[in-house]
């Protein structure tokens, strides 16, 4: 709907009102979250101290025209730290951001909503690290559930990178269904173990019989990080049978890296 053109006097009033609003320094929705993130990074010395002297740089908040607002920072443990703000549905926006940035890993806090956890695993096209109750724990092992199926070598590579970063060992853990034989001597398993051994990371391997989810949860403790493969079932099968990574995530309170 287009109304009549306003008078010159009215136009001046509108401009005056806009100038007044700008002088009040209102923040766009969500900017306070970026400021909180900036303060957290600053307090933990994760960004260059030269960029923290004057506080959160609102004047450097950039709108890229793609529905994203950003602040570019220099990190201390990595080269770049970008604070990115999107508004909208969390699943849709995360999915778009992962596709836009081509991220390898998305790090998220554990959601209390089961449906949201399911959607995050299903629709975000990257590996996902779910951080549960993290408060500067000292992790002593990586728990690597191994099922002898294709795709486990990539999971092992992620496990090794995390183990090296934290200077810890890896517990390889295999759960066998009742009355099923082990594939421990298979060429594929040997390849995975050889890769881990050559990395210099200390490791052990244990096999147990029983329910996969129950055994993984029993094996995990508060000082371990689980690194496991994402479910390769179709969405319909996951809905009917349930996803092992999702079940472990919902019942465990340790960080879980789900590798896709």
Language-model segments: what does each one mean?
Residues 50-52, 82-85, 130, 172, ...:
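A structural preference for short, hydrophobic beta-strand core positions in alpha/beta folds
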Residues 181, 214-216, 234-238:
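Short active-site-adjacent structural elements
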Residues 46, 126, 168, 201, ...:
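Short glycine/serine/threonine/alanine-rich loop segments
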Residues 1-27, 49, 141-206, 219, ...:
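Small/aliphatic-rich secondary-structure junction motif
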Residues 37, 94, 159, 192, ...:
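Aromatic/hydrophobic pocket-lining residues that form π-stacking "cages" and hydrophobic walls in ligand
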Residues 52-68, 72, 76, 81-93, ...:
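Charged docking surfaces used in two-component/phosphorelay signaling
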Residues 83-137, 220-260:
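Gly/Ser-rich helix-loop-strand patches that form or flank binding pockets
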Residues 26-50, 62:
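N-terminal positively charged helical leader segments and presequences
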């Amino acid at each position: 709907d287009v109304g009549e053109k306003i008078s010159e006097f009215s136009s001046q009033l509108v401009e005056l009102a806009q100038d007044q609003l700008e002088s009040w320094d209102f923040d766009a929705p969500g900017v306070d979250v970026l400021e909180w993130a900036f303060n957290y990074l600053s307090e933990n010395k994760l960004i260059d101290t030269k960029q923290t002297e004057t506080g959160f740089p609102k004047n450097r908040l950039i709108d890229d025209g793609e529905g994203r607002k950003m602040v570019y920072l220099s990190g201390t443990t990595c080269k770049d730290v970008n604070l990115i703000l999107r508004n909208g549905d969390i699943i849709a926006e995360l999915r778009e951001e992962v596709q836009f940035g081509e991220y390898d890993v998305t790090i998220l806090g554990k959601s209390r909503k089961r449906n949201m956890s399911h959607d995050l695993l299903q629709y975000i096209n990257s590996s996902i690290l779910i951080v549960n109750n993290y408060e500067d724990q000292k992790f002593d092992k990586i728990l690597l559930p191994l099922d002898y199926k294709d795709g486990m070598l990539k999971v092992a590579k992620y496990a090794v990178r995390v183990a090296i970063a934290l200077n810890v060992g890896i517990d390889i853990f295999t759960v066998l269904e009742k009355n099923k034989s082990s594939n421990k001597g298979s060429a594929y398993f040997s390849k995975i173990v050889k890769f881990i051994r050559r990395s210099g990371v200390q490791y052990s391997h244990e096999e147990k019989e029983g329910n996969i989810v129950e055994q993984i949860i029993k094996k995990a403790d508060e000082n371990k990080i689980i690194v496991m493969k994402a479910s390769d079932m179709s969405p319909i099968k996951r809905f009917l049978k349930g996803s092992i990574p999702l079940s472990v995530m919902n019942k465990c309170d340790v960080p879980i890296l789900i590798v896709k």
